[in-house]
Swiss-Prot record:
Disulfide topology: none
Catalytic activity: sn-glycerol 3-phosphate(out) + ATP + H2O = sn-glycerol 3-phosphate(in) + ADP + phosphate + H(+)
Domain named ABC transporter: residues: 4-235
Any single biological process term in GO: glycerophosphodiester transmembrane transport
Keywords, alphabetical: ATP-binding, Cell inner membrane, Cell membrane, Membrane, Nucleotide-binding, Sugar transport, Translocase, Transport
Originating organism: Salmonella typhi
Subcellular location: Cell inner membrane
Described purpose of this protein according to its UniProt entry: Part of the ABC transporter complex UgpBAEC involved in sn-glycerol-3-phosphate (G3P) import. Responsible for energy coupling to the transport system.
Full protein name: sn-glycerol-3-phosphate import ATP-binding protein UgpC
């Protein structure tokens, strides 16, 4: 096994536009890291720099304690799995998996041994003589992974490998990837825009935005304690409710436009008068009553999801989404009285967006 280290890595186009801000990341031996973020955030560019397909503008990349910053891709000890399977249509599954080893000059016996072992791990034993056109999307992606496995790389690089699959296959392949990593324990760097993939596959998640690593942490840490307003809005489905306001002069209330306010703890008195964003996840909002001082939500629409429901509505001029139990189905125009538990709230600086 081998670790991966990025040391103050940057990438600029034309010497001007910096698409990757100075970024440092230590990936332990056998760790599975997922980079997630919206299109254009720099995650695929960063992966390509690790692979050697893009030059680093500044900084260093280390794989298995070796500096590989200027090395060619073939010398870095990596194997890459792409969104597009990139299989040779005229070759069988076995030939596709073996091709990279053949051009490296390995013996036939050694190649056969590696291919058979990879096929066994990926349950492709009965498909080795088939051509790609005879396979399903999930089977083709397993062949692409098998081609990477036979290389026995120091690091696996995955570039949105499940994006071309339908919803059911994506679930199946996520489970297979988890099982594969438990067996191989190979250091892995995985890129996706799908937060469900990120949260279910990763040992640690790196949330990226405009070339910056906004937060690096376990899925639980990123969900429970988002480091910034961006992370709070990106991680979670539906997204966290975000309310813009200001800490009152007395420091004991969060004041919103339209005369609305929420009581807050004494710990924020030092922030009196500061603009803030208050966040709370839809699943953390509780039902209350007018007598208990609840917040009135006028229901606009109801999404019935099966296991639970989402009520979209307004508290004054503020939009809120609340997750309800399956049997709770308020009609449009009705009022729900809500409680926003203080221990479930998050506060972010109104200017920097960073967690307070």
């Amino acid at each position: 096994m081998a670790g991966l280290k990025l040391q103050a890595v940057t990438k600029s186009w034309g010497g001007k536009t910096q698409v990757i801000q100075p970024l440092t990341l230590d990936v332990a031996d056998g760790e599975f890291i997922v980079m997630v973020g919206p299109s254009g955030c720099g995650k695929s560019t960063l992966l390509r720099m690790v692979a050697g397909l893009e030059r680093v503008t500044s900084g260093d990349i280390w794989i298995d304690r070796k500096r590989v910053t200027e090395m060619e891709p073939k010398d870095r000890g990596i194997a890459m799995v792409f969104q597009n399977y990139a299989l040779y249509p005229h070759m069988s599954v076995e030939e596709n998996m073996a091709w990279g080893l053949k051009i490296r000059g390995m013996s036939k016996a050694h190649i056969e041994e590696r291919v058979r072992e990879a096929a066994r791990i990926l349950e492709l034993d009965g498909l080795l003589k088939r051509r790609p056109r005879e396979l399903s999307g999930g089977q083709r992606q397993r062949v692409a992974m098998g081609r990477a496995i036979v290389r026995e790389p120091a690091v696996f690089l995955f570039d949105e490998p499940l994006s071309n699959l339908d919803a059911k296959l994506r679930v199946q392949m996520r489970l297979e990837l988890q099982h594969l990593h438990r067996r191989l324990r190979t250091t892995s760097l995985y890129v996706t825009h799908d937060q469900v993939e990120a949260m279910t596959l990763a040992q640690r998640v790196m949330v990226m935005n405009k070339g910056v690593a906004e937060q690096i942490g376990t899925p639980v840490e990123v969900y429970e304690k988002p480091a910034s307003r961006f992370v709070a809005s990106f991680i979670g489905s539906p997204a966290m409710n975000l309310l813009d306001g200001v800490i009152s002069a007395s420091g004991d209330r969060f004041e919103l436009p339209g005369g609305l306010a929420l009581p807050i703890g004494a710990g924020y008195r030092g922030h009196a008068g500061r603009k803030m964003t208050l966040g709370i996840r839809p699943e953390h909002i509780a039902l209350s009553s007018q007598a208990e001082g609840g917040v009135p939500l006028t229901v606009d629409t109801l999404e019935i999801l099966g296991a639970d429901n989402l009520a979209h509505g307004r508290w004054g001029d503020q939009k809120l989404v609340v997750r309800l139990a399956h049997q709770q189905r308020p009609a449009a125009g009705s009022t729900l009285w809500l409680r926003l538990p203080e221990h479930q709230r998050h506060l972010f600086d109104g200017e920097t967006g960073q967690r307070v």
